Amino acid sequence: MTTSRRKAREIVLQALYEQDLAGHNAEDVLKRLLTENPQTEENVEFIFRLTNAVVKHKDLLDENIRQFASAWPVEQLSYIDRNVLRLAIFEIIHENDVPVKVAINEAVELAKSFGGNSSARFINGVLSSVSKALADTANQREE
C-alpha cells in the first residue's frame, strides 16, 4: 500500500526527473501532476516545498553525491537514480521531522518502483554512507 507521503515523494521525483531530462519547469510539471493526482493540502505544500528545495540546492546535493558515490560521475547516473539521491540526501540533511531510516527506506522504495535492477541496492549504499558520515560528524561535535 502506498502511503500518502510516499505518493507525494513519487510526484516530487516525477517533477525532478522531467525537469532534469527535458528541462521543463518543475513547478509547471507539479501543477500538471497534481491535476492528474490530487493530493491533500498538506501534501501539496510538502510536494512544492521539497521540489523547490531540491531544485534550489541541486549543486550542493550533487556535491554530496560526488562525495559518497565517487566511482560514479553524477552526470552518468540514470536520471532516476540521480534524482532519488538528490531528494533523499536533502531529506536526510534538512528535513529534521523525517527520521534518517525513513528517508533511506522511502528512497529505496522509489528506486525499486522507478529505477533499474540494481538501483535500490546502489541508492541504499550511497545513502547509508551519507547517514554514517552525518552520524560521525554529530558524534565529533558532542566530544
Curated annotation (Swiss-Prot):
MF-aspect GO terms: RNA binding
Its gene name is nusB
Q: SUPFAM superfamilies per the record?
A: NusB-like
- InterPro entries hit by this protein: NusB-like_sf, NusB_fam, NusB_RsmB_TIM44
Task of the protein = Involved in transcription antitermination. Required for transcription of ribosomal RNA (rRNA) genes. Binds specifically to the boxA antiterminator sequence of the ribosomal RNA (rrn) operons.
Please give the Pfam families that the UniProt record associates with this protein.
Answer: NusB
Q: Which family does it belong to?
A: Belongs to the NusB family.
Question: Which PANTHER family did the record assign?
Answer: ANTITERMINATION NUSB DOMAIN-CONTAINING PROTEIN, N UTILIZATION SUBSTANCE PROTEIN B-RELATED
Q: Which organism is it from?
A: Dehalococcoides mccartyi (strain ATCC BAA-2100 / JCM 16839 / KCTC 5957 / BAV1)
Keyword annotations of the record: RNA-binding, Transcription, Transcription antitermination, Transcription regulation
Is RNA-binding set as a keyword in this record?
yes
Highest taxon of the lineage? Bacteria
- Descriptive protein name: Transcription antitermination protein NusB
| GO terms of biological process kind | DNA-templated transcription termination; transcription antitermination
Keyword check for RNA-binding, yes or no.
yes
Q: Where are the transmembrane segments?
A: none
Any one GO CC term of the record: cytosol
